[in-house]
Swiss-Prot record:
Organism: Burkholderia orbicola (strain MC0-3)
GO cellular component: cytoplasm
Keyword annotations: Amino-acid biosynthesis, ATP-binding, Cytoplasm, Histidine biosynthesis, Hydrolase, Nucleotide-binding
Family from the record: Belongs to the PRA-PH family.
GO molecular function terms noted in the UniProt entry: ATP binding; phosphoribosyl-ATP diphosphatase activity
Protein name in UniProt: Phosphoribosyl-ATP pyrophosphatase
Reaction(s) catalysed (UniProt annotation): 1-(5-phospho-beta-D-ribosyl)-ATP + H2O = 1-(5-phospho-beta-D-ribosyl)-5'-AMP + diphosphate + H(+)
Name of the encoding gene: hisE
Length: 121
């Protein structure tokens, strides 16, 4: 990820964070925060479904720009969700950096081992 990409995510996250205490009648993000966990999480599910459908459309000759737009919507709502749970893009970036260089199989095995250790097993 380039520094400018990370900066974009962090700037957007800062705007989203600033909406936490905002007027739900004046801000879509404030409205989502005000509605609580279920509304935020439902929106993630809706946007993820739209990404899947747009990806399938691309395979059928649909516009790739539609897929990009849907992924942007999903990423935006993921940023809202992270903020709602007092997390930030930096937390996700740190986790991706931690995983970098590990195969998916290695990462999954390490995660399972860590979970067993945390659960006393």
């Amino acid at each position: 990820m380039t520094q400018s990409t990370e900066d974009t995510l962090l700037r957007l996250a800062a705007v989203i964070d600033s909406r936490k205490g905002g007027d739900p009648d004046q801000s879509y993000v404030s409205r989502l925060f005000h509605k609580g966990d279920d509304a935020v999480l439902k929106k993630i599910g809706e946007e993820a479904t739209e990404v899947v459908l747009a990806a399938k459309d691309v395979r059928q000759g649909g516009a790739p720009t539609a897929l990009v737009g849907e992924v942007a919507d999903l990423w935006f709502h993921c940023l809202v969700m992270l903020s709602h749970f007092d997390l930030s893009p930096a937390d996700v970036i740190a986790e991706l950096e931690r995983r970098e260089g590990l195969s998916g199989i290695e990462e999954k095995a390490l995660r399972k081992r860590r979970e067993r250790e945390e659960n006393g097993g």
